[in-house]
């Protein structure tokens, strides 16, 4: 099967030029490793006097000069780095049931550790090794830090070095999701001392979507700024959808393996067992999944604490494991077999995303006993993961009113020893179906300010249906706003410069620059042009809100002219 190539060269260039006009891709070389080239987006000012570099998650999909054929996937950027470490070996991947093997360019040979030693970034970091991935990240994160000092000297540390990246990973305060079987991924970092990241969830269901649509969703998500993508498919062709996504993704891909494991036993929860789950883990490890959500903190004795909740257990993975524990009257097999799971993870460098299966699903249930019992257990599991040189981050809620968000962050830091926190929102009110990308972005900005490292987006379709491509874009933009607002509040200099540049353009009526510096130039331009569509209006010193006589900025310019005589 050959999919329609979504972005043929001209279509792709037209799309990128529409989404990000006056932008080009620029590659910054490494200094420790001479084979590193970090792709950034350069936004050119309309008068061509200046430009700024911004973090770009789109990989080759946002490079107008590169043709991407999604039927063959993107360049394996990290493959030589992985092979050069001489701690991996090729072997024949295990056969996969119910897979059409339609991604014909993918070899049956995959990588794993060639000894009992881990091949994880945390293992290298603890052994004082600065990997190419770490230098790549330092270049990405360090963008504009020196430049901003001339504007605003009282900001965070002026430079992020590869050594600083290594230290943060070694301590467990940050993770680099980078499966050795996903060499297409461009290294990124999740940790509170770095830019706040966002995740976009995609995936089919039994009633909607197909492979091509999910690949399109992924490309749209990363084009607009998603730092990672989770494939939460629960319908048909789960394995094949994931193969297409991974082979075309420059960002880390996460999954919830229990979904595919349940699919293998025809949806009968009682038929699940650790052997089925383990087989699924290895299949996905061989494909290149970069992080797994594992709901190992849903313990049998915690389930009764959800009985009096308004909305019970709302996590799909949490509900599956709670149901399994109740049917068999046994402890969660993800918990009892956790160390064996660690052994699998460290052979491929897959990061744990320790799932919050008992997260609150309504404001009424926020910060209750069940939620915090599980969080304490996730902290204990983090210690075990670290003992095995596995990377780990902690998932968080959910639905939490604004005044209770800080308590979540404080308890997570206490129980989980500063492992990165990764939250779904949280939604700050339950009364706005259709607008939950807004209700949750409010909570996301607050928790990001308090120290959450990655924000899982919520789309307008939350609680209503499966998101389409427009919903994905709306969710990503809402969460880019939240993450950027958090970065500003934390004093991250890489965030400040873009605000400064856009405000300068706004005050000086540089309309094209104002559009192009925004997160969504196409929307900004279209809203302006609804009432003032002519090109002449792009040089006018007013918009349709105030008109030429009541524009405060125009009047301020007159004041300045008067005061300078």
Swiss-Prot record:
Substrates-to-products reaction catalysed: 5-amino-1-(5-phospho-beta-D-ribosyl)imidazole + S-adenosyl-L-methionine = 4-amino-2-methyl-5-(phosphooxymethyl)pyrimidine + CO + 5'-deoxyadenosine + formate + L-methionine + 3 H(+)
EC annotation from Swiss-Prot or TrEMBL: 4.1.99.17
One Gene Ontology biological process: thiamine biosynthetic process
InterPro entries registered for this protein in UniProt: ThiC, ThiC-associated_dom, ThiC/Bza_core_dom, ThiC/BzaA/B
Binding-site list for substrate: 201, 230, 259, 295, 315-317, 356-359, 395, 422
Co-factor(s): [4Fe-4S] cluster
Positions of [4Fe-4S] cluster binding: 543, 546, 551
Gene3D superfamilies: 6.10.250.620, Radical SAM ThiC family, central domain (3.20.20.540)
Keyword Zinc belongs to the record: yes
PANTHER family per record: PHOSPHOMETHYLPYRIMIDINE SYNTHASE, CHLOROPLASTIC, THIAMINE BIOSYNTHESIS PROTEIN THIC
Family: Belongs to the ThiC family.
Protein name: Phosphomethylpyrimidine synthase
